[in-house]
Amino acid sequence: MTSFPASHGFGPRKRGYQMDLTNVQPVENKPAWISMKSPLEKEIANEYEALKVTERKEDTQDYNEPELHNSNDPTVDLYADTYATQAATESDSELEDALFSQLDEFDDTAYREQRLEMLKKEFARVEAAKEKGHMQFLTVENEREVMDFTLSSKKVVIHFYHPDFIRCKIIDSHLEKIAKVHWETKFIRIEAANAPFLVVKLGLKVLPAVLCYVNSQLVDKIIGFADLGNKDDFETSLLEFRLLKSSAIDRLKEESSSNKSIYHDELQNNQSDDSDFFE
């Protein structure tokens, strides 16, 4: 057997022969045999990932929000929505009195009492949701916040945007409207440049990108405007209906303001067929 000088490090047992050159290469350029893991290594890696998920869930316990279930009662849901959208302009006591007085019209005492109890619980859920940042379109600055919200909130809609892309601004204007009336869902946005890990992990190459999570699971991706008619002046209700199909919101709600984007007028004569590519 040929012997190699120890100082040269060329022997088959020497690290320099097999590892040094490949270690400096990007992972995707390494030979397949270097990327292969033994069953034990795979088991250790899986346990490590599970531990990280557990630790993250423990870290976000303080962020956990109350269950915001749909009451499945149209009357109660309507009053709760009214309470959520008007409480900012009317005193809570005046609004509650107005809503409760409408229930007094029912002759069935048992029915009225049942609905009053449901209303009180629904109002409490609305207040809890608002305290947790619902009914706002929040801008977050880092990926950790995005992951925390995704783990701690039952329903989350995330917009990955670029500040200079006009279509991202259009999506922002629609999501801001939707967020104000859908108190059951958290709406957030993050600049794509501030989320490099998530952009790569989620394979985002075109902006705007809207991702919907329910119970920490990705349920829908809306990339560009291809699924929104591929035009800039689509109505808010179109995006709202898409979110409903994904279960990212509970139900459609009436809007008092115009359904058109705030950019509708200036974009009527500036239609574009392409979304913006993010690199």
Curated annotation (Swiss-Prot):
Pfam families: Thioredoxin. GO terms for biological process: negative regulation of signal transduction; protein folding; response to pheromone. Residues 137-248 form the Thioredoxin domain. Coiled coil: none annotated. The keyword Cytoplasm applies. The keyword Nucleus applies. CDD domains: Phd_like_TxnDC9 (cd02989). It is found in: Cytoplasm; Nucleus. The modification Phosphoserine is found at residues 272, 275. Gene3D superfamilies: Glutaredoxin. Residues 56-70, 254-267 have a biased composition (Basic and acidic residues). One of its GO terms (cellular component) is nucleus. Belongs to the phosducin family. Inhibits early G-protein signaling events following pheromone stimulation. May help create heterodimerizable beta-tubulin by facilitating the efficient transfer of nascent beta-tubulin polypeptides to the folding apparatus. This is Thioredoxin domain-containing protein plp1. It comes from Schizosaccharomyces pombe (strain 972 / ATCC 24843). The gene is plp1.
